[in-house]
Amino acid sequence: MFDLLNIVLVEPRFPENIGSVARASANFGSAPISLVKPEMWEIEKASPLATKQGLRLLEQIRVFDSVEKAIQDCVFCIGTSARVGGVRRETVSPKECAKEIMRYLEQGERAALLFGPEDRGLENHHLEHSHKLVTIPA
């Protein structure tokens, strides 16, 4: 079922962080990973952090030139953001985010979870494609 969830990393800066995402994804059900305009994508640098289970996900990564293309086959998208208010969409808790996404996956529909660059997060033009936002307490 988690193969219907698309983890989208927008403009990631460090391959090592992509490897960490692959490891986490493998530990929680192996959702595929898409990259949008990565600053640097080198599987050799990502692999040590992905571990054996995440390596398969790294080998299957798809790279896109826009968020729109990365999520084109998804019917629901949640963006991550540390900022709330302003022109932002409805914000849900991580627990509510999981429930919302599971509703789509259980119906056999694709959903996406957007994460922004490590140093600044998603910008408004990235979030335009999100139906809702989730703020993850850090």
Please give the residue ranges for each predicted region.
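Post-transcriptional modification and biogenesis factors for structured RNAs
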Residues: 1-138
